[in-house]
Structures are given as C-alpha cells and as structure tokens.
Amino acid sequence: MIRNIFLSVILSISSFVFLLHASEKPSSLQNDLSQFLPEEKDIGEWKRDGSPQEYKGEDLFLYINGGAEIYHEYGFKQVIVQDFRNKNGKSISVEIFEMLDSESAYGIYTFKTSTEGKELSLGDIAQLEDYYMNLWKGNFLVTLTGFDEEEETVRGLQEIARAVEAKIKTKGKRPLLVSMLPEKDLVKPSIKYFEGNLGLYNNYPFFTQDVFSLKKGVKGDYKTGYSIFLFSYKNSEEGQNRFIDVKTSFKESQRYKDFNPVGDELFKVKDSKGKLIFVAHFKNYILIIMGKIDQSQVRDIFTNIQK
C-alpha cells in the first residue's frame, strides 16, 4: 500500500516536471531572438562588437525615443540589437524585430521603405537604400544600418542580411487587402500597409483625429499621378457607418473645400493645396482616390475594384 502511494507520488512529480519543461521549451525557443544572429564564420571579416541588447514590449520606448509608437501600432513583441565591426573599423548595426504576425511585419516593412530603394532577392522582400537595409520574412523585420555608402559597407550589409535571413525559417504572405489594389501602373515600392491611424497620418494627414477608425488599410501610388487608399472594416454595417462619419468630417473640415456629393456612395473634395480627393464606400470598404484623375476614371476604378 505504502509502496503504491510512493510510486504514485513519484509519477505525479515526474509528470509535473515533464509538463513544466514541455511548456517552457517552446516559449523559450520562440522568444530567443539571439538564435537569429549570424555566426561569425558566416559573415567573413565581420565580428560582433559588444553584447546584444534586447527590448520587449514597452521597453522599446527606452531604445527608440519618440519612435516606438509606430512599432506598437503594428504589433511589436520584441527586438534584439547587435553591432558588428570589421578590421577596417567599419560598423553595421543589426536590429531583428519580432512582430505579432506576418501582416504586422509586412506593414512596418512598408512603413520603413521607400520608392528610392533597390529591391533585393532576400527573404519575402528586401530593400537597400544608401547604407540602410530592410528585410521582411515571416513575422520578422530585419533592419541593418551602415554608417557610410562605401562598397565595403554595402557589401557587408548584404552579407550579414543573408546570414540572418538563412536562420529565419518562417515565410510571410502579403495581406489580402494589398492584392485588391489595381495592378495597372501601380508603383509597387510605394505600397504602404496600415494597421492604425499613426501609419496613415505619416503617409497623408487626412485628419489629426482617427476619423477612419482605421485597423486595416493599404495605399499605392500610380505612375499616372494618383494614389489609391483602401480601408477595410469588419462588416458592411461598420463600413457604412464609418463612411457616413467620414463624409461629415470632410464636409465640416476647414482644411477641405468644394465638397460635392456624387451619388449616395461617392463624394469629392479638394485639400488645401487643390488636390482632388474622391471618397467612396462599398461593402465593408472605404475607397479614396486622390491626385491627377478625372471622375470617369474614378468610376472605372470603383467598378473594377469591386470585382
């Protein structure tokens, strides 16, 4: 009897310890960003310069003074920072951001890149601009910063980026909303994916307040001189209610003029610089087209984007 009780206790303790380690192991692996830092044998003459620094959650404000809000809007989890130096004194800083999901990482990637950069075949997508490089793969954004544009530094950026990318095994997928942008004449590096008003405001400040109640949105520029914004809502009712509020805000704002309804689901205004803005609603979306475009073209885009 006593022996059976003793064995039961031992088995219970063993099971508890096993479950404890089983639950801790995936979490530890998931949160250990140091596993993505490149080995020195894989990056030629570049060596680690100092110890890595890690910031999680709200601690990001300690690292990025005045710029952490946008990362949190997109869904920031944590970042690891490691500096590298070569024998000639050249320096490169590597930041590996873990975001909430693939869409979050793609969004912050589009926020940090521009039409001026050179696209590279790394990760899901990567861009090099001067001595600054961004790479998106899965739910990670990798940012590498050199401190000059010399060939040695630029080559180092790409060498280190390849080593980091090889360690990230997950792959990402662009948000479905991005695929709704018309392909014809789209300047692909101009695409911006939003997950809140701060990202939108930094791209074009329609209003200081979050009039659109934006959670998911996309924007693309077109070669013919106009831009398309598309915002997504949970359902048609929410989209309709938001459109009504947006319509009122444009109409009453001192920043816009020449408000003109064009049917029940479309109106146009001009901003303070005379730029023409068309705003429409369909299903659970709000569509904005602004720039050099006439009303007939807007109608065509409005029709095609609903297909």
Describe the residue ranges of each PLM region.
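Soluble, non-membrane globular domain cores that form compact, hydrophobic packing
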Residues: 20-307
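Bacterial N-terminal signal peptides
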Residues: 8-17
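Positively charged n-region of N-terminal signal peptides that target proteins for export
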Residues: 1-5
